[in-house]
Amino acid sequence: MSSKAEKRKYTYDWPMAALTVDGIVFGFDPNDDINPLKILLIRRAEGPFIGHWAIPGGHVNIGQNEGLEDAVRREVQEETGARFEYLEQLYTFGDPNRDPRGRVISVAYIALVRKADYEAVVGGDDADLAVWYPVNKLGQIKLAFDHRKILSLALKRLQGKIRYAPIGFDLLPSKFTLGQLQQLYEAILQRDLVKSNFRRRILSMGTLIEIGSKAKLKSGRPAKLYQFDKKKYEKAVELGFNFEL
């Protein structure tokens, strides 16, 4: 094949869909006793759905050979300034009518961040505002496209996975109290947990390190601080350990 033929662009004989990514970024605020679980949202500065809230995301740079994970990291950073380590693919959304501009297929990802690292998120690119919004108040706002459906599925995935994997530690400060850990689980699972049972179970796993210092609380005595021992957890998993709560 000649070099000219190799460089020639291939043209399909049928219409092609646009490929996009969406980044559902969860954060946790232990200082918010009412609405501690947050989601990172942007307000759309352009149509369609101008002025509506939306999940950060956008088109994959096909021409630059960009991968899906690279695309979602780039889009979230461009639109909010946030970066993250934990990332997992949620689902592919391809309803023919999900975008009024044409056929758009979106691959959605869940990301977890320590909210304290990104308190001052700023809207950028085609977003005029970025905010941490309480998950339990999403029903009060207008969301663009099929993003309400996407967020609902993302929350269900988070609720399911936190029961058998230690992903919650990607949302907590690196040093945390058992009270903050229980607060996180209750916020995600959306139900109260028995304090004594929760602490007994979590401490029996042997994956927490008591660091020897204490945190001052709003009321009551200072609480012990802990860290998650990831290496010990990974070693325990190799031996058949089950994190299930």
Regions found by a protein language model. Give the residues of each.
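Short helix-coil junctions and helix-kink-helix linkers
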Residues: Q183-D192
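Short, His- and charge-rich active-site/binding loops that engage polyanionic ligands
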Residues: N35, I39, R43-E46, I50-H52, ...
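Long, intrinsically disordered, low-complexity Ser/Thr/Pro-rich regulatory/activation regions
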Residues: E210-L245
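NUDIX/MutT-family hydrolases
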Residues: I110, V121-L158, L171-G179, N197-T207, ...
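Short Pro/Gly-enriched beta-strand edge/turn motifs at strand-loop
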Residues: S2-R8
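Core subunits and conserved enzymes of cellular information-processing
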Residues: M1, F28-I42, E69-T80, A223, ...
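Active-site segment of metal-dependent pyrophosphate-handling enzymes
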Residues: A17-L19, N35, I62, L68-R73, ...
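N-terminal strand-loop-strand
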Residues: R8-A54, E69
